[in-house]
A protein has these predicted regions:
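Conserved active-site-adjacent core of cysteine acyl-enzyme catalytic domains
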Residues: 5-6, 44-162
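Active-site nucleophile-adjacent alpha helix/oxyanion-hole segment immediately C-terminal to the catalytic cysteine
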Residues: 1-52
Length: 162
């Protein structure tokens, strides 16, 4: 089987500050679903468990992922490893995935997974940090799964449309 990519393609967005990768990636999901991304912060602000204006300045914590997904009407997963065939089927069923992790020591980050080749175990993703040419990157599922124990134990560290 060849690389499966979500359709329509995700429109890449650059994050404006070092703490807003989570927000830029949510915006990409909203735009992909043809929903108004300006509603993200107001919807989150309605939750007693979230402080989105603080989060814009400080990033998203693992404990804020599940409440964020719930506030925005997103599905959530992420506690454990994923597998190429499972990820491919998830992309086919739900579209792009918001994924939080710590791929560099002491630097949590969020990306949007846009494609997967189940035979090769490779993915395509959008990294919103300093992505000046607004391109997709490539990696393998093992890289995706090496996102740090804290994030891999966080239900909600992967979000998607239901």
């Amino acid at each position: 089987m060849a690389m499966y990519k979500v359709d329509p393609p995700v429109v890449p967005i650059n994050q404006p500050t070092s703490t807003t990768c989570w927000y830029a990636c949510l915006q990409m999901l909203f735009i992909w679903k043809k929903k108004d991304p300006s509603k993200i912060i107001p919807l989150m602000d309605q939750s007693p468990d979230l402080f989105p204006y603080y989060m814009l300045e400080n990033g998203i914590a693992p404990s804020e992922c599940k409440p964020t997904a719930k506030a925005l009407g997103l599905g959530y997963a992420g506690d454990g490893d994923t597998y190429p065939d499972v990820l491919t089927n998830a992309l086919k069923s739900h579209g792009p995935y918001w994924v939080a992790g710590m791929w560099k020591k002491n630097h949590s980050h969020v990306i949007v997974v846009t494609g997967c080749n189940p035979d090769l175990g490779t993915i395509t993703y959008i990294n919103p940090w300093c992505n000046f040419d607004l391109s997709e990157s490539k990696a393998d599922v093992d890289w995706l799964n090496a996102r740090g124990d804290v994030w891999k134990q966080t239900l909600g560290s992967m979000m998607y449309w239901i």
